[in-house]
Design a protein with these regions (language model features):
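Acidic, low-complexity terminal tails and accessory targeting/binding regions
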Residues: 2, 68, 84-114, 144, ...
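Phosphate-coordination/substrate-recognition cap region in phosphate-metabolizing enzymes
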Residues: 35-121
């Protein structure tokens, strides 16, 4: 039986001009992850990431720990199927109508720029609409389209894998959520309730044999918990 380890990227730069950059905390999370995996003796046959910088930087920061110990590291393969959905595009497309139909949304929005919990509230309302699929304007990647994209990436991995391989996939919370939805047949709304709980640099293990895939573990972040440093356990 083979294993795919879905690894969420480290904390990105919320509120900065460029979100797609690991914060100092995100870099530390990735380094801690790499040391933990190396200590476990977990050696990967393949390593895949999307083309987002936060995903690839998480991979490089983690595997720097392997290099320091002389452990083998496979070359990074890039597959854009594992990119996150475009949250900014979804917000731009769906926010105007939300503000006209949800009276509380405008007040939440006023506080969202500097307050992560308020941003989370408005974003959750927008995601509800995106999942419903009834508000999507032309050109916006739909939830169903996103799921199909992620599924195609998983299929490419499985087609090239044998049943003994260990494969690391450095990706994002939404991508992991889509795979949970596909593999467990969990309703999309329920899967997104779990999405909000996915910790940065958490491990989510899939077991596979041929085309059959099962969820083996979800949101494991023991590497962070062992440090007893709550500031390293982040969700955004």
């Amino acid at each position: 039986v083979g294993s795919i380890y879905l690894i969420r990227h480290g904390q990105a730069s919320f509120g900065a001009d460029d979100y797609d950059v690991l914060s100092p905390v995100g870099v530390e999370q990735a380094q801690v992850l790499g040391r933990h995996l190396a200590d476990m003796g977990l050696v990967f046959d393949r390593c895949v990431a999307g083309d987002l910088r936060r995903q690839q930087h998480t991979a490089s920061a983690a595997f720097d720990q392997y290099h320091a110990l002389g452990l083998p590291v496979p070359a990074l393969e890039v597959d854009c199927a594992f990119n996150e959905f475009d949250a900014d595009a979804i917000i731009r497309a769906l926010l105007p109508d939300l503000l006209t139909t949800e009276p509380e949304a405008l007040e939440i929005l006023r506080n969202a720029a500097q307050n992560r919990s308020e941003f989370q509230r408005i974003f959750a309302l927008i995601i509800e609409r995106w999942l419903a699929g009834t508000y999507d304007p032309p050109g916006l990647e739909s939830w169903l389209g996103f799921v199909e994209r992620v599924q195609s990436g998983l299929q490419r991995i499985l087609e090239a894998a044998d049943n003994t391989q260990k494969i690391a996939v450095f990706t994002s919370g939404g991508t992991i959520t889509a795979l949970l939805h596909l593999i467990t047949r969990m309703p999309a709304a329920q899967a997104f309730e779990l999405n909000w709980q996915i910790v940065n640099t958490s491990l989510n293990q899939l077991k596979f044999r041929g085309r059959e895939v099962a969820l083996a573990s979800f949101n494991s972040h023991t590497h962070l918990q062992l440090l007893k440093a709550p500031q390293l356990i982040t969700f955004r």
